[in-house]
């Protein structure tokens, strides 16, 4: 799960903390169901953008539901595929929540990030980086694609 509270400063932090608390309290279920759970329970905040992803290793897919300007990408064998995040603000205005499934292959990277990163990054500019630890991929994206005047969050995970 990745979230970004709407706005800046303490009010945005309240929204982000509420998302984290509700995510921890949510029943283990599909990404869509978890996102619906969070949406209903953070209405007292100014809202957030939220992405929830779940690996299904048996089916070799990732299930994903996202609302707002969260960038979500699967990188497999050098090919980048965007995952769909629908418009809206969790806790306030959404037209619906949908869950999508995306195929994964061995060594696929799943990258989620907030709008604090420019989404025009290209892992091909860093030969061999995709084979390194996910934390190094995340740190490199944060360093080189981070917007200096915005907070940023990055989540990178790898399949095996």
Regions found by a protein language model. Give the residues of each.
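Conserved subregion of the PPM/PP2C metallophosphatase catalytic domain
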Residues: 1, 6-160
């Amino acid at each position: 799960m990745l979230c970004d509270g709407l706005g800046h400063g303490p009010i945005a932090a309240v929204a982000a903390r509420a998302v984290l608390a509700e995510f921890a309290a949510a029943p283990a279920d599909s990404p869509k169901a978890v996102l619906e759970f969070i949406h209903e329970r953070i209405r007292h905040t100014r809202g957030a953008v939220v992405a929830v992803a779940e690996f299904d290793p048996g089916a070799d897919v990732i299930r994903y539901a996202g609302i707002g300007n969260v960038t979500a990408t699967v990188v497999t064998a050098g090919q980048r595929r965007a995952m769909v995040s629908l418009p809206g603000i969790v806790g306030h205005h959404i037209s619906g929540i949908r869950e999508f499934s995306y195929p994964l292959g061995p060594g696929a990277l799943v990258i989620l990030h907030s709008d604090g990163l420019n989404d025009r990054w290209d892992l091909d500019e860093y030969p061999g980086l995709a084979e390194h630890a996910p934390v190094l991929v995340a740190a490199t994206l944060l360093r080189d694609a981070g917007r200096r005047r915005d907070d940023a969050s990055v989540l990178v995970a790898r399949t095996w």
